[in-house]
């Protein structure tokens, strides 16, 4: 089975605080991976690097065999990498469709035409029997 995701020696520091110290792992296609650790262990920092929110100080990420630059959320999104936060909330000032769009795309995409997203939302609603 081929590798879906390879994290190679990822390190990230905030001043003197070492959040990630040469973290490496491989996730194969179809595998489910859980990252466990105490509060402050660096789990969220690692996820923020993977999703492009932070640039790592050292190391590399490969997604489906291609190097994924860190610190570039648009590239992670285009590769299909996303995250559901542990404590997520919906934005009350947005419609259901807009909340779904920002769960998949960046906030900038709210200014783009919503017709393709609406079509996809309706298809998924039908597929899963949602009103």
Please place each PLM-identified region on the residue numbering.
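Glycine-rich phosphate-binding loops of nucleotide-dependent enzymes
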Residues: 1-131
């Amino acid at each position: 089975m081929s590798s879906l995701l390879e994290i190679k020696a990822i390190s990230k520091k905030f001043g003197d605080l070492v959040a990630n110290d040469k973290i490496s792992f491989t996730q194969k296609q179809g595998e489910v991976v859980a990252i466990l650790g105490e509060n402050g262990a660096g789990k969220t920092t690692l996820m923020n690097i993977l999703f492009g929110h932070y640039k790592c100080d050292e190391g590399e990420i490969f997604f489906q065999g291609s190097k994924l630059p860190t610190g570039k959320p648009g590239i992670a999104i285009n590769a299909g990498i996303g995250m559901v936060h542990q404590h997520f909330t919906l934005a009350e000032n947005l419609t259901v469709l807009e909340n779904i769009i920002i769960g998949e795309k960046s906030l900038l995409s709210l200014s783009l035409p919503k017709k393709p997203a609406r079509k996809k939302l309706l298809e998924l609603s039908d597929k899963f029997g949602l009103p």
